[in-house]
């Protein structure tokens, strides 16, 4: 493609849309990051960054974090709500609460909190959904607003720890998820001499659409029904503690793609709020929960990997709907809280790793079948020879279908012992040749060709074997078909010569990425420069900062990857601030209660028994290094 330009690459990978200006492709065809969006001219080439890290001893794969992106996301979200509050003359403020379940890494939480250091009035709190998370936020929330929201199921210990948080100077909202929690909170608060701050999670009738819609609606796992809400009100009145009810919470589900769903949910919850006020409650906070989506594919659509709205529109809709309802009921306007973890963290992290090998189809010379060969083979040979002579575009479809049908029958006859292995191999090669040549003559300008072109593209795509575990680093791609943008880190200034699928190094056929972002939406293959064994070929997996680390598992005992924190200094220079080593083999063995020390003793016994004396020291050293080594492949970095 002689007229290829760098803008074609930017369009082909849709990077201008899913990246929101944080990632890009340089004029030299290198993938870049702009860690500090206030200085877009200070971009970092990811390919060179990865090579520098490898030279310094950091093996691939490596998860690269850009903390300045976290700061930018916090400030952007707060600014959007602050502007909406001013625009609609809303009579209360906004608080952003980070649910640490999205990414509990210390570096991430501390950087999110650090974004508020220079704020005169911090607009950031933390959310916990379990006892371990609560213990973490009790030690960190004072670095921002000291607001803590406690969600999830709660036992006595959880509730007491939350109440102790009040004694430590925090503002801890205990959100009632079940009716039975109220009694425990009231009893333990009296024992500790603490006035609790209570919240109610209401179960809305409306249910947002998407993969996580089950977390909202009448059948959701959490929340109180309308009648249960009234029971709580009566119980608090009887205890003369109605003033303790200070927060209303609801959750439509994560990754809400349609802004109309958000408007409708806020509208229903807003009426809950006003009705509670009419009953004498003094609710001060309106917590819209999560739902703010991330546009993973950059299509700005209602797909489950996208969103049909922007940040300003999101804030404006919530503020305007709540303003109108409060004015209608003549009730005071509550502080607005949102729990937007994915929006804050997804963009800040990139997984960088290397392609360790490929498998690609290359046309081979094929001899015609022998005269006495089975008729099926002659049919396939005839189909191949028919391609070049067919001017009728619809006839090409017939050739394709005939050849696929014949190949299926070949496989059946081979399984019955009626065809030889040589016959089968010949038929498979002819079929690939037919597919290859049809791919060259079919055209997407014919609508009836398009489905077959898609099939051929997928069938003939190269296989890229990539040094990572899908289950450890991109578990959502496997578990829920989540789409993540993927790009080669260099060579993008030239037209892509191949299309490929990415396969990980686990011994599992599910370790394959099935969906790829491109300029047309979601495809089953990715356009890529040709691979060469002569030089490193690096791939970036983008927007992996939300949930992926904590959800990742150790399939085949591939452990945590190396990680690094990268920051731009005041002069625009790139600083590798810290590197956290990934799991060693000994680490992952210990996680599954296998003892590397006892293994080493066993190795020594076996070496002494089976290895000649002059080799023993070297063999033992290799075994020891194996236990200390990285769980991923190291020879290719």
Curated annotation (Swiss-Prot):
Its cofactor is Mg(2+); pyridoxal 5'-phosphate. Pathway: Amine and polyamine biosynthesis; agmatine biosynthesis; agmatine from L-arginine: step 1/1. It catalyses: L-arginine + H(+) = agmatine + CO2. It is an enzyme of class 4 (lyase). Disulfide bonds: none annotated. Its EC number is 4.1.1.19. Keywords: Decarboxylase, Lyase, Magnesium, Metal-binding, Polyamine biosynthesis, Pyridoxal phosphate, Spermidine biosynthesis. One of its GO terms (biological process) is spermidine biosynthetic process. GO terms for molecular function: arginine decarboxylase activity; metal ion binding. Pfam families: Arg_decarb_HB, Arg_decarbox_C, Orn_Arg_deC_N. CDD domains: PLPDE_III_ADC. The modification N6-(pyridoxal phosphate)lysine is found at residue 101. Substrate binds at residues 286-296. Belongs to the Orn/Lys/Arg decarboxylase class-II family. SpeA subfamily. Catalyzes the biosynthesis of agmatine from arginine. This is Biosynthetic arginine decarboxylase. It comes from Shewanella woodyi (strain ATCC 51908 / MS32). The gene is speA.
């Amino acid at each position: 493609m002689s007229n290829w330009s760098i803008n074609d690459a930017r369009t082909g990978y849709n990077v201008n849309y899913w990246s929101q200006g944080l990632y890009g492709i340089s004029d030299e065809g290198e993938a870049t990051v702009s860690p500090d969006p206030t200085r877009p001219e200070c971009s970092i080439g990811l390919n060179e960054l990865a090579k520098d890290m490898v030279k310094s001893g950091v093996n691939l794969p490596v998860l690269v974090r850009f903390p300045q992106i976290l700061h930018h996301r916090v400030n952007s979200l707060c600014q959007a709500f602050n502007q909406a509050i001013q625009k609609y003359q809303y009579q209360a403020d906004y608080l952003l609460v980070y649910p640490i379940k999205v990414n509990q890494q210390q570096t991430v939480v501390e950087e999110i909190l650090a974004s508020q250091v220079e704020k005169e009035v911090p607009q950031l709190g933390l959310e916990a959904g379990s006892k371990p998370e609560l213990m973490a936020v009790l030690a960190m929330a004072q670095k921002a607003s000291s607001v803590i929201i406690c969600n999830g199921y709660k036992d006595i210990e959880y509730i007491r720890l939350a109440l102790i948080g009040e004694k430590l100077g925090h503002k801890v909202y205990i959100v009632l998820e079940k009716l039975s929690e109220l009694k425990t909170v009231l009893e333990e608060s009296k024992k500790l001499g603490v006035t609790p701050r209570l919240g109610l999670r209401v179960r809305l009738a409306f249910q947002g659409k998407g993969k996580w819609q089950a977390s909202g609606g009448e059948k959701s796992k959490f929340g109180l029904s309308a009648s249960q809400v009234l029971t709580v009100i009566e119980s608090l009145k009887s205890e003369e503690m109605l003033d303790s009810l200070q927060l209303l919470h609801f959750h439509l589900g994560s990754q809400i793609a349609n802004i109309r769903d958000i408007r409708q949910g806020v509208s229903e919850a807003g009426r809950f709020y006003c009705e509670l006020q009419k009953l004498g409650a003094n609710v001060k906070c309106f917590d819209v929960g999560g739902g703010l989506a991330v546009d993973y594919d950059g299509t700005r659509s209602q797909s489950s990997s996208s969103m049909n709205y922007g940040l300003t529109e999101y804030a404006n809709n919530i503020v305007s709907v709540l303003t109108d309802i409060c004015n209608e009921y003549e009730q005071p306007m509550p502080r607005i809280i949102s729990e937007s973890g994915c929006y804050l963290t997804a963009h800040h992290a990139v997984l960088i790793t290397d392609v360790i090998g490929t498998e690609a189809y290359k046309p081979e010379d094929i001899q015609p079948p022998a005269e006495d060969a089975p008729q099926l083979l002659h049919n396939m040979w005839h189909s191949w020879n028919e391609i070049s002579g067919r001017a009728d575009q619809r006839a090409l479809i017939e050739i394709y279908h005939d050849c696929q049908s014949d190949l299926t029958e070949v496989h059946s006859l081979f399984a019955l012992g009626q065809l030889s292995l040589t016959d089968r191999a010949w038929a498979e090669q002819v079929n690939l040749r037919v597919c290859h040549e049809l791919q060259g003559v079919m055209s997407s300008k014919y609508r009836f060709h398009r489905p077959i072109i898609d099939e051929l593209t997928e069938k003939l795509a190269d296989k890229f074997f990539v040094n990572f575990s899908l289950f450890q680093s991109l578990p959502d791609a496997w578990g829920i078909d989540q789409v993540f943008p993927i790009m080669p880190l260099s060579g993008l200034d030239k037209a892509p010569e191949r299309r490929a699928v990415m396969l990980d190094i686990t011994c599992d056929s599910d370790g394959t990425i099935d969906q790829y972002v491109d300029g047309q939406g979601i495809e089953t293959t990715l356009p890529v420069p040709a691979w060469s064994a002569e030089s490193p070929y690096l791939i970036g997996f983008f927007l992996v900062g939300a949930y992926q680390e904590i959800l990742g598992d150790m399939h085949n005992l591939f452990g945590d990857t190396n990680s690094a924190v990268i920051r731009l200094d005041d002069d625009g220079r790139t600083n590798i601030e810290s590197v956290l080593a990934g799991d060693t083999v000994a680490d992952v063995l210990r996680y599954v209660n296998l003892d590397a020390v006892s293994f080493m003793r066993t190795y020594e016994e076996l070496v002494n028994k089976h290895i000649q004396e002059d080799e023993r020291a070297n063999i033992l050293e290799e075994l020891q290094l194996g236990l200390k080594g990285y769980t991923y492949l190291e020879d290719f970095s």
